[in-house]
Amino acid sequence: MTPHNEAKKEDIANIVIMPGDALRAKYIAENFLDDYNLVSSVRNIYAFTGSYKGKRITVMASGMGMPSMGIYSYELYKFYDVDTIIRIGSCGGYSPDLKLFDIILSEQVFSESNYALNANNEDCHLVKASDEINNIIEKTSKDINIPVVKGTTACTECFDLYMSDVHKVLDRIPSDLKPIGSEMEAFALFYNAKMLGKKASCLMSVVDINVDNDGPKASATAEERETGLNNMITLALESALNL
């Protein structure tokens, strides 16, 4: 147990699927897992452990933003002996080729944040996903015909729709990186995995397209953001079967 997680160590599986939204974690447990139990609800950050096609899996919310993801993923790795966390979430799409609900598989994530400096006194702003986990996800995506778009992603500290000038933020990103999407949690997850010798990956479903200073050109509804992501959820769970 930790101040943020009331589960006993044995209540948490060594593979965790991690949406940001606690209600999405509940949705996954109710619609995809067998014999699941709620093992933590501190701060209404739900964690459920059950089985998917016989594989023991925990689904736990991270909350929004790097500080929240940083706490929950660190504790799972450090105190619950979790080996692998696959983040599943939503993102804004920056590539003109993306469509709503396309699934991005982040190969590496860039952030301007000082998360790594705070956590580990390292001036680090670019961190990779686990190649092993990404390779499994990519193979699984082909096997079950749920395609992914691979690329670099950005991790911001402000919701991009609320930025006064999103173009200035994008212009500060090194020109060779060219992020295809943006979210708010993956850098903390990937860095914690790197720091603690664990594995992490991130799947994102595109819910806003071509965000600019006038807003997105297409956007999913609040209901779609909660429940309209079944392909991504299925891909994460099917990939977990191969871990």
What is each model feature region?
Residues 1-136:
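Metabolite-binding pocket within alpha/beta catalytic cores that recognizes anionic/polar moieties
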Residues 22, 92, 154-160, 188, ...:
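Glycine-rich beta-alpha junction loops
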Residues 35-41, 145-152, 243:
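Flexible, glycine/charged-enriched surface loops at secondary-structure junctions
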Residues 112-115, 161-163, 210-215:
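Short acidic/His/Gly/Ser-rich catalytic and metal-binding motifs that mark active-site loops
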Residues 127-176:
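Active-site rim beta-loop-alpha module in soluble metabolic enzymes
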Residues 136-144, 192, 235-243:
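Generic non-transmembrane alpha-helical segments
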Residues 210-243:
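His/Asp/Glu-rich mid-to-C-terminal helical/loop segments that flank catalytic regions of hydrolases
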